[in-house]
Amino acid sequence: MRNNKTPFLSAIFTASIRGYQRFFSAFTPSSCRFYPTCSNYALWLLCFENPLSAMGKIAIRILSCNPFCSGGIAYPTTRLKRPSLLQSHKDFNRNFKTITFWLVPTTKSRTTYYIIKV
């Protein structure tokens, strides 16, 4: 399910966000009004979205983080095709994978999911 279309661009954005978290955000007090934080929101979104469309959603999220916004819980959303039952269970006996994210369907449509990290 992860984004493999442009791994180089995703890797650059992910490395820059992780650098921000490690070197800048660690030395400032926690001030994000949302859960997940804006940097975690960006990392989660980069796993599932095209990096350019993810950057648009990340920019909207950062612009909404201001004193006039009350904040709260705002999970990132993505649009995915639901795999057929045969596709989702074909490697069941061979490969056990660790669950990293839950994709919870939204009420908006059948292809839009909330991304929630386990």
Curated annotation (Swiss-Prot):
Which coarse location class describes where this protein primarily resides?
membrane
Compartment list: Cell inner membrane
Please name the InterPro entries in this protein's record. Membr_insert_effic_factor_YidD
Record flagged with keyword Transmembrane: no
Its Gene Ontology cellular component terms are:
plasma membrane
What is the topology of this protein in the membrane according to its UniProt annotation? Peripheral membrane protein
Q: Pfam families of this UniProt entry?
A: YidD
Alphabetized, the UniProt keywords read: Cell inner membrane, Cell membrane, Membrane
NCBIfam families to which the protein is assigned, alphabetical: membrane protein insertion efficiency factor YidD
Q: What family does this chain come from, according to its entry?
A: Belongs to the UPF0161 family.
Q: What does this protein do?
A: Could be involved in insertion of integral membrane proteins into the membrane.
Return the protein name. Putative membrane protein insertion efficiency factor
Protein source organism: Helicobacter pylori (strain HPAG1)
